[in-house]
């Protein structure tokens, strides 16, 4: 039954039998779980109900599976030892990467200069690690971590700090993408720090890519950064104009504010020859698999963070947009949005089966899949990115610091 439950998670649209199979297995696994006591099977069922394989962050699930396998009386000790050794060796590499990035972050002195931003470097690195953990993608992970860190600063600035006039200037500066723009537009001092830091990060990335004669690929990431910032600015105009847009308008803008189109394009930088110019041309056209991943990211973020954001003063989320447009309660809006997320997972599964091995290599598609998995993990029960001192902090410690003995 557990295997059927896991398999049914990969269903696509119009697969009514698998829809029924998922409902059936979910119901019965929940019913039998209390009767399994503290057995190994109980642990596996409990974990699967919360994090099915479809949603699992690979390194997190690998650590859990090693523990499950060790408890199996029929385990192969040689295989178990090898799995532990492999995990710990990779963990040492990941720890070194995080140390290198932490040094860069501290040199920026961002937190001291911008006290309103979320200081979440370890969590951002975990995000990148969820996209790809393999040793050959070390450079790509560093690039992606720095990129997401800068996005987080920009997001916080648009959400909670910048005035509309200041955000207008910053949006124009991003559009110009020139170091002189900060002085020409007379950006506020705190925005100059972000702007110059962002351009410095991209200069570093360009140098890294120059070694492979691929520095031109950075332009794809810059294009998506501009689109994302423009979408953030659109949200700011809604907030300051006290406007609640229609759901369709919100979702169109939300593809960009999820940041996942930009992050996906940037995640391929540093991956070597597997990411070709044709691949980047494909991704910036927002293929359905990427749109699905972006919708999942946008809506999960909204569901778990909208109440806190509305308290402090922020643009309307999908919840507020849906409530106003259709005249429903918050609970009804949540149910509808959960359905949209579920359908987006079906879209994502379907597009993966279509595209895999035909247009885009599997390793690149898995970056998009894994981005959806990470967002599912971080926003499963709470906004664990904003409130990271809860469960996420413990997970980051187990994955990056604590070796398997």
Curated annotation (Swiss-Prot):
Keyword Transport: no
Pfam families per the UniProt record, alphabetical: Terpene_synth (PF01397), Terpene_synth_C (PF03936)
Protein name from the UniProt record: Sesquiterpene synthase 16
Sequence positions that bind Mg(2+) 3: 309
Keywords: Magnesium, Metal-binding
Keyword Metal-binding appears in the UniProt entry: yes
Binding site for Mg(2+) 1: 155, 159
Gene: TPS16
Co-factor binding comment: Binds 3 Mg(2+) or Mn(2+) ions per subunit.
Example GO molecular function: magnesium ion binding
Family statement drawn from the similarity comment of this UniProt entry: Belongs to the terpene synthase family. Tpsa subfamily.
Highest taxon of the lineage: Eukaryota
Pathway(s) of this molecule: Secondary metabolite biosynthesis; terpenoid biosynthesis
Domain comment quoted from the record: The Asp-Asp-Xaa-Xaa-Asp/Glu (DDXXD/E) motif is important for the catalytic activity, presumably through binding to Mg(2+).
Cofactor: Mg(2+); Mn(2+)
Motif (DDXXD motif): 155-159
Annotated InterPro entries: Isoprenoid_synthase_dom_sf, Terpene_cyclase-like_1_C, Terpene_cyclase_plant_C1, Terpene_synth_N, Terpene_synth_N_sf, Terpene_synthase-like, Terpene_synthase_metal-bd, Terpenoid_cyclase/PrenylTrfase
Positions of transmembrane segments: none
Binding site residues for Mg(2+) 2: 155, 159
């Amino acid at each position: 039954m557990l295997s059927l439950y896991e398999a049914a998670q990969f269903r696509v649209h119009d697969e009514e039998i698998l829809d029924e199979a998922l409902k059936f297995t979910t119901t019965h696994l929940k019913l039998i779980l209390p009767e399994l006591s503290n057995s190994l099977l109980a642990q596996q069922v409990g974990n699967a109900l919360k994090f099915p394989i479809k949603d699992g962050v690979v390194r997190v699930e690998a650590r859990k599976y090693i523990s499950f396998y060790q408890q199996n009386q029929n385990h192969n000790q040689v295989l178990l030892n090898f799995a532990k050794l492999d995990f710990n060796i990779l963990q040492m590499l990941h720890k070194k990467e995080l140390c290198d990035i932490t040094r860069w972050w501290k040199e920026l002195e961002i937190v001291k200069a911008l006290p309103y931003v979320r200081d979440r470097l370890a969590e951002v690195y975990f995000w990148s690690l969820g996209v790809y953990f393999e040793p050959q993608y070390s450079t790509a992970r560093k690039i992606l971590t720095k990129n997401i860190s800068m996005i987080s600063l920009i997001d916080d600035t648009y959400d909670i700090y910048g005035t509309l006039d200041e955000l207008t200037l910053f949006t124009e500066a991003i559009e110009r993408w020139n170091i002189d723009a900060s002085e020409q537009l007379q950006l506020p001092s705190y925005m100059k720090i972000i702007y110059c830091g962002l351009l410095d990060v991209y200069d570093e990335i360009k140098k890294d890519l120059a070694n492979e004669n691929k520095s031109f690929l950075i332009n794809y990431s810059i294009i998506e950064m501009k689109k994302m910032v423009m979408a953030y600015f659109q949200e700011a105009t809604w907030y300051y104009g006290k406007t609640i847009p229609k759901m369709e308008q919100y979702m169109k803008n939300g593809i960009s504010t999820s940041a996942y189109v930009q992050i996906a394009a940037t995640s391929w930088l540093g991956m070597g020859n597997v990411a070709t110019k044709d691949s980047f041309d494909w991704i910036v056209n927002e293929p359905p698999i990427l749109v699905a991943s972006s919708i999942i990211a946008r809506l999960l973020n909204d569901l778990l963070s909208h109440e806190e954001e509305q308290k402090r003063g922020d643009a309307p989320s999908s919840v507020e947009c849906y409530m106003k447009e259709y005249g429903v309660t918050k609970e009804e809006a949540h149910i509808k949005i959960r359905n949209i997320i579920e359908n987006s997972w079906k879209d994502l599964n379907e597009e993966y089966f279509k595209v895999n091995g035909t247009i885009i290599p599997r390793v690149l598609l898995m970056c998009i899949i894994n981005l959806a998995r990470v967002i599912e993990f971080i926003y499963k029960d709470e906004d664990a990115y904003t409130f990271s001192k809860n469960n996420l902090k413990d997970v980051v410690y187990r994955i990056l610091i604590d070796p398997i003995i």
